[in-house]
UniProtKB/Swiss-Prot annotation:
This is sn-glycerol-3-phosphate transport system permease protein UgpE. The complex is composed of two ATP-binding proteins (UgpC), two transmembrane proteins (UgpA and UgpE) and a solute-binding protein (UgpB). InterPro entries: MetI-like (IPR000515), MetI-like_sf (IPR035906). SUPFAM superfamilies: MetI-like. It is a multi-pass membrane protein. Its main location: membrane. The chain crosses the membrane at residues 14-34, 86-106, 112-132, 146-168, 201-221, 248-268. CDD domains: TM_PBP2. PANTHER family: ABC TRANSPORTER PERMEASE PROTEIN MG189-RELATED-RELATED, SN-GLYCEROL-3-PHOSPHATE TRANSPORT SYSTEM PERMEASE PROTEIN UGPE. Part of the ABC transporter complex UgpBAEC involved in sn-glycerol-3-phosphate (G3P) import. Probably responsible for the translocation of the substrate across the membrane. It comes from Brucella abortus (strain 2308).
């Protein structure tokens, strides 16, 4: 039994509070800046209390302000990011789940060779893969399409490895029982593996959704049409619009609105996310 010491508890809580402040302060600072005019933002020091233009800034940014700056509405930027993040998260989970299922539960020649070929891709930096991938997308005519934005990012060696490690912990008795019941591979996957994997899938979904939402380099390469930009690319274009007249109030509003979906995903799936991480490490 671990002895509870008041001093240790106090130090632990102080460290946690400090960590929360370090993480939360930039978000709060951005929110405060989103309630001020662009002139107030570029004249430090900025007040730590919200300004008088909160509603006005958000209303103007949503109803045409951002579109005047980058040529595409804020709603379209958010929608593009949502489509990309959902497609990448769901696509990675489906492909990785099926790949791990085949590697663990099917016996075919060179299956471990194929697994290690998938795993070795983790050692390749993005810069090595991005140019040949871009060439393929150009040749297939997928520039400025959702397919071009998402398909190259759907394969995931990490998710395949995690699913494989989890499937290896499935008792052999379950597999034998499924065979005795005359259950085929897909029925076994649907009725046994999917229910057992739901917490792992939830944890991976949160991680992969954030990964897809925050993509910058790939969308920057494969989108020329402003209407296909994601919210991250939109932010970059707003900052680069004109150094002397950058609408920093719109930039801060857009940054806050870009964070909200990620916070909602984490909060709504927090219980499943934590449970999935704990069960994965067992």
């Amino acid at each position: 039994m671990i002895e509870q010491r008041p001093v240790s508890n106090l130090i632990g809580h102080l460290i946690l509070i400090l960590g929360i402040i370090i993480v939360a302060f930039p978000i709060y600072y951005t929110f405060v800046a989103s309630s001020m005019t662009s002139t107030q933002i570029i004249r430090p020091p900025i007040s730590l209390l919200p300004g008088d233009h909160l509603v006005e800034n958000y209303r103007e940014a949503i109803f045409g302000g951002v579109e005047r700056v980058v040529g595409v509405s804020l709603e379209r930027l958010l929608w593009n990011s949502f489509v990309v993040a959902m497609a990448i998260a769901v696509g990675k989970i489906i492909i990785s789940f099926m790949s791990a299922f085949a590697i663990v539960f099917f016996r075919f020649p060179m299956r471990m060779f194929f697994f290690w070929m998938i795993f070795i891709t983790l050692m390749l930096p993005v810069e090595v893969r991005i140019l040949p991938t871009y060439k393929v997308i150009v040749d297939l005519g997928m520039i400025d399409t959702y397919a071009g934005l998402t398909l190259p990012l759907m394969a995931s060696a990490t998710a395949t490895f995690l699913f494989r490690q989890f499937f290896l912990t499935i008792p052999g008795e379950l597999v034998e029982a499924a065979r005795i019941d005359n259950a085929g591979p897909f029925r076994f996957m649907r009725d046994i593996l999917l229910p057992l994997s739901k917490t792992n899938i939830a944890a991976l979904f949160v991680i992969l959704f954030i990964y897809g939402w925050t993509q910058y380099l790939w969308p920057l390469l494969v989108t020329n049409d402003a209407k296909m930009n994601t919210i991250i690319i939109g932010l970059r274009r707003m900052v680069d619009w004109a150094d002397a007249s950058t609408p920093w109030n719109y930039v801060m509003v857009t940054a806050i609105l870009a964070i909200i979906p990620l916070i909602l995903v984490v909060v709504l799936m927090q219980r499943w996310f934590v449970k999935g991480l704990v069960e994965t490490e067992k």
